[in-house]
Amino acid sequence: MKDRYILAFETSCDETSVAVLKNDDELLSNVIASQIESHKRFGGVVPEVASRHHVEVITACIEEALAEAGITEEDVTAVAVTYGPGLVGALLVGLSAAKAFAWAHGLPLIPVNHMAGHLMAAQSVEPLEFPLLALLVSGGHTELVYVSEAGDYKIVGETRDDAVGEAYDKVGRVMGLTYPAGREIDELAHQGQDIYDFPRAMIKEDNLEFSFSGLKSAFINLHHNAEQKGESLSTEDLCASFQAAVMDILMAKTKKALEKYPVKTLVVAGGVAANKGLRERLATEITDVNVIIPPLRLCGDNAGMIAYASVSEWNKENFANLDLNAKPSLAFDTME
């Protein structure tokens, strides 16, 4: 049987990435050109800057991904691409490159939801057993997803306001930490003590919804009031207290979801899945199901995860025409 090679593109935010997946499960290359240094001085991602960077490097990323995989353009079987959610200008760069490659070589084009990519990155660890539950935590999303089978995703709970990664970046900015602040807050949290009483919104409510705006506001108010009074607060203790509140919320809602949807597997994915504190809490508190977390290199935005997610779409022959457009607000269906 002839080997199948999927060339995948990911440009939904500030990483330009191209990957090659062989026969459903062998990731031959996963090239990532990060723009973090360009956005640090702005304290966040500037959409126009992100789009321009994608344009500048995407051709080189394609060439490097193919070379690293040891294949040529003629060996590629199909092209997969993120078409949402994300920044519309950034998405369009990846879409344009993917569609051009597919058209030039007469290849099928596979549309992939960015969040499905995060979830299916877990496939790189071990074959997934369905049905499963997923906790997706990133800079733009915090949601619990029920997956009845590969490619069938239903939201069962999500944030009412800020995403967890967004909350990390906002409190990091208040403390003067560099963007993105998640990793630094995690490191500082392990050096401090949970001594500040921050709110855990909706933690006792019988639903699967999250809220982080109250926690974020309480943190900002505490920091601001201390500054006004000329008081000095321990950055380590602030980070430890903030992270403890975040983890309490995530753990409480995830446990409720596992009670409501009895599954054997929990996938935890997205950029925040790289958080050491989250991994520690999962290891000690959720022991009755198989918890799968993608390796660190596949937690952030990358095309490898898009390639993994494209396999189920290929199997369903879910191909797109060349008029495929960006859907910046694309979302999974909600469980009825």
UniProtKB/Swiss-Prot annotation:
Which InterPro entries does the UniProt entry name for this protein?
A: ATPase_NBD, Gcp-like_dom, KAE1/TsaD, Peptidase_M22_CS, TsaD
The cofactors named for this UniProt entry are: Fe(2+)
Enzyme group, top EC level?
Answer: transferase
Q: EC number(s) per UniProt?
A: 2.3.1.234
Q: Which of this chain's residues are annotated to bind substrate? A: 136-140, 169, 182, 186, 275
Q: Which residues bind Fe cation?
A: 114, 118, 301
Q: Which domain of life is it from?
A: Bacteria
Molecular function terms, GO-annotated? iron ion binding; N(6)-L-threonylcarbamoyladenine synthase activity
The UniProt entry's GO CC annotations, sorted and at most eight, read: cytoplasm
Q: Which UniProt keywords apply?
A: Acyltransferase, Cytoplasm, Iron, Metal-binding, Transferase, tRNA processing
Q: Which GO terms of type biological process are on file? A: tRNA threonylcarbamoyladenosine modification
Q: What does this protein do?
A: Required for the formation of a threonylcarbamoyl group on adenosine at position 37 (t(6)A37) in tRNAs that read codons beginning with adenine. Is involved in the transfer of the threonylcarbamoyl moiety of threonylcarbamoyl-AMP (TC-AMP) to the N6 group of A37, together with TsaE and TsaB. TsaD likely plays a direct catalytic role in this reaction.
Family named by the database record: Belongs to the KAE1 / TsaD family.
Q: What is the protein name given in its UniProt record?
A: tRNA N6-adenosine threonylcarbamoyltransferase
| Originating species | Streptococcus pneumoniae serotype 2 (strain D39 / NCTC 7466)
- Quick one: which gene encodes this? tsaD
